[in-house]
Amino acid sequence: MSRYRLNRPMALEEAAVLPDGAGGHALEWHALGTLWAELRPGAGRERRGEIAPEGTMLFRIFLRAAPQGSPQRPRPDQRLREGARIFRILAVSEADAAGAYLICHAREEVPA
């Protein structure tokens, strides 16, 4: 039996830089697939945003492992989405000695 409860479907997304038609570029996110995860909250804080205060919350997200280089293995330049919630991946490592699970350290930013 697993010590992780992978009961939340989360979309793994990757950014693509596209021309915006005005000489610049726009960032567009597209889904690579769905991963089942367990979400564990960490520390949170409030900081000054451009318009209003912003809350920043850190999370640990546990997933089934995938080999290095696999498109199913998250990377720090990607993000996980659960509905309207977006979690930017900061770091990825093995969660257990057997290498059966991964832990993604992620940040969710929401308006306060």
Regions found by a protein language model. Give the residues of each.
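Short, conserved turn/kink motifs that form compact alpha/beta structural patches or helix kinks used as
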Residues: 24-112
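Active-site-proximal polar cores
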Residues: 1-25
